[in-house]
Amino acid sequence: MLVLGIESTAHTFGVGIAKDQPPYILANERDTFVPKEGGMKPGDLLKHHAEVSGTILRRALEKANISINDINYIAVALGPGIGPALRVGATLARALSLKYNKKLVPVNHGIGHIEIGYLTTEAKDPLILYLSGGNTIITTFYKGRFRIFGETLDIALGNMMDVFVREVNLAPPYIINGKHAIDICSEKGSKLLKLPYVVKGQDMSFSGLLTAALRLVGKEKLEDICYSIREIAFDMLLEATERALALTSKKELMIVGGVAASVSLRKKLEELGKEWDVQIKIVPPEFAGDNGAMIAYAGMLAASKGVFIDVDKSYIRPRWRVDEVDIPWRN
């Protein structure tokens, strides 16, 4: 089985190709929109994705050394994400499905992150941290679905850091040589400032932390503010994670999503693993950020259980939660 996956939920347009036997991932091509200033404007994302979609599709097919006719199914991330960006990927997927008579497989973006994590880390039954620009979720698989044990009550961890560095003119670009701008700034900071620390059970809140940090700009060294906001945010996440580990008694902790690439977070998680006698499984950097390979792979798993969708019902779902998705391949 060969599945072509299309990712376009936010700033990245990606096309991946997966097959149902090793090495599983045959291609993983993408192009990421980087704004010249400010944040991501939906109209700019739509324009970028539309412009690069054809090139990325061709590159993926060339990388896999196959033609579109060799593909069995077309998988597409229908949500969650930014509406105009999602529509580009959905439109391309529908067109390919109709033109080449290929069944369409609906994929939840978060499930894509999680499943590529299972593949690349070889985790068996983990507690999962799904951390990205739009999501901060603590989850695990139980009785047919991924059940959420904790999440952000407002903005996501990645979004909070992106907004801060943008507001203080440290970004864009947000990622420089594999490091987030807040990590680079934090390297010269050492003073831990007093900022809000909000953990409620296994849920977290980052909006107050962001607001308080911005109010300190001009009053404290920027490097110390960056250091403090990062350390406090990560410590909040670790406290919520420890509570979930105590509740679930899991012996594996898997981290997926773009924030999983953070070296400083990895170090904290490794320490947590030693304290709790838990194996830490972190998705490789090349699969941490948004990519088409994760959509192709999750689509392949879904297709193996007959999960398809008619083209005329393939609506985008900008607020599609991971705990709303049935997972028949893990029953």
Curated annotation (Swiss-Prot):
Fe cation binds at residues 109, 113, 130, 290. It is found in: Cytoplasm. Substrate binds at residues 130-134, 162, 183, 262. Keywords: Acyltransferase, Cytoplasm, Iron, Metal-binding, Transferase, tRNA processing. Its cofactor is Fe(2+). It catalyses: L-threonylcarbamoyladenylate + adenosine(37) in tRNA = N(6)-L-threonylcarbamoyladenosine(37) in tRNA + AMP + H(+). Its EC number is 2.3.1.234. GO terms for biological process: tRNA threonylcarbamoyladenosine modification. Gene3D superfamilies: 3.30.420.40. The keyword Heme does not apply. Transmembrane segments: none annotated. Required for the formation of a threonylcarbamoyl group on adenosine at position 37 (t(6)A37) in tRNAs that read codons beginning with adenine. Is probably involved in the transfer of the threonylcarbamoyl moiety of threonylcarbamoyl-AMP (TC-AMP) to the N6 group of A37. Belongs to the KAE1 / TsaD family. This is tRNA N6-adenosine threonylcarbamoyltransferase. It comes from Saccharolobus islandicus (strain L.S.2.15 / Lassen #1).
